[in-house]
Amino acid sequence: MAFREDFVWGAASSAYQTEGFPAADGGGESIWDVFCRRPGTVANGDDGSAACDGYHRFAEDIGLLASLGLSAYRFSTSWARIDPNGDGRWNEAGLQYYDRVVDCCLANGVTPWMTLYHWELPQALEETGGWQDRGTAERFARFAGMMAAHFSGRVSHFITLNEPQIVLKLGYADGIHAPGKRLLLPELVSCWKNLMLAHGLSFRAIRNAAPEALIGIASTGKLCYPHSPADETTARQETFRLTDADWMFTHPIVLDAVCLGRVEPEPGALRGLLSAVTPAEWDTMHAVPDFIGVNSYNGSEIAAGPDGVPVYLPRPQGFACTALKWPVTPEIMAYDFAFLFDRYRLPLYVTECGLSCNDHIFLDGQVHDADRIDFLHRYLLALCRGCERADVRGFFHWSLTDNFEWHSGYAERFGLIYVDYPTQKRILKDSARWYAQTARENGKNV
């Protein structure tokens, strides 16, 4: 088995998690700057004030990525750094920073993939309602159009939103991500609608400004895989099922809206609230991307119970898990990309996949992360099988470097590159070398 000849091998990062120095050169506050100052919100009181110092060390990191033979770098631009007040008065110094990042990628033979929203909402917009306010969607579209016009000809791949599901669930429902709210269902549906409108409006703004660019969205959500071949239909149906109790962390709540122009939950309060979405709003949301990014980490094993009712099978004692206690389930790569491709019929990219390990510097000065190599090997083997049934065109490891892992702070390490935070020294982990070989051989070594 092998991947397609033009398969994209890359790594990913985000602005707040890596850059640090958000106020440098006239940058504005984001909701994460404010959230991190609230006691008890982030492990160990950590924040993104320094992060990996990517603001000053981006050239080193891009150089390391290029040295690994990776062809693409997915990163986000901080809306707050470029548009401090969310009012369209652009901070030229912030824009010039991303000029340097993009030009550095191109100089190193690396294709930049630009994510326009990876949760860096200007705090000024949160104070006027954030994603509860439709005006935020319109302001984001203005930002996206400006960015596309500015980088047209240098950036050929734009992603509108990263994981709207997580913005909604962790930021506005559970309150464990910025802005730290706990809203009720009607308010959550309003936030969802504005996020989907933001995709639709920004998609059109990017298309108008950079007609040749490819535009995607990065989705996440529950993934189910069958216990046996006889359970595949049940696992597929459960992957796309929407209920009042289980709708925010699902792919169809985003992808059905943008790809199909409709969302059809089971009977309940959610269905009633969605019935108030106007035909014009559905039309705006319905902006079919050129590709779908899938952020894939783990899933659930499903069997068909009596009358086909899905049964979530318990994980056996000692089941493999990551340092974050996320289960290791490579089966999702074999099945769920086929499920997604069959439903949406669009090219797919793995825009995030990786794990947190208890990485440390060994006595020999190196970082030996055998768990990450094994994880990647298993997931890529399964993805090879998935490629037989789906149009999968690339894989971006999450993440390029260790970084600020949101409410977990710096306790979790996802990178191919180890960051010694006191010194900001970078060390290639063993997994980086393994992944580099995999990219060179286009996966033939898996």
How would you name each of these model-derived features?
Residues 1-42, 66, 85-87, 95-446:
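Active-site region of glycoside hydrolase catalytic domains
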Residues 43-57, 131-134:
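Active-site mouth loops of central-metabolism enzymes
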Residues 77-90:
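Glycine-rich, proline-tolerant flexible connector loops at the mouths of alpha/beta enzymes
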Residues 6-8, 55, 72:
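A common structural microfeature
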Residues 57-78, 287-292:
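Catalytic domains of carbohydrate-active enzymes, especially glycoside hydrolases
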Residues 54-63, 84, 94:
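Internal amphipathic alpha-helical repeat/solenoid segments
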